[in-house]
């Protein structure tokens, strides 16, 4: 899989795309009570944070997660507005190269 460093999503585009995918699939993958909680609390305490892919993704995918091309977006709620997300609803792995659409999600259990 050949990828181009000059054809990547920006960090903001990556966050936006991950959040859009999360919203589209949340109803089918989260407990209904979690969906209600997230929707009620998101404006005050919700967020999405961008990271390099964590090591444990290797248990779920069988390809190289080069941080130049892959990002992990954590979506959830924080204790306080602007705080660190500690109530995680989904971890989204995205390929940032625009010609290689790839997404894996680990949902809250």
Curated annotation (Swiss-Prot):
Q: Which domain of life is it from?
A: Bacteria
Gene3D superfamilies annotated for this entry? dsDNA mimic, putative
Physiological role: May act as a double-stranded DNA (dsDNA) mimic. Probably regulates the activity of a dsDNA-binding protein.
Which family does the similarity line name? Belongs to the putative dsDNA mimic protein family.
Please report the name of this protein according to its UniProt entry.
Putative double-stranded DNA mimic protein Ent638_2296
Organism of derivation: Enterobacter sp. (strain 638)
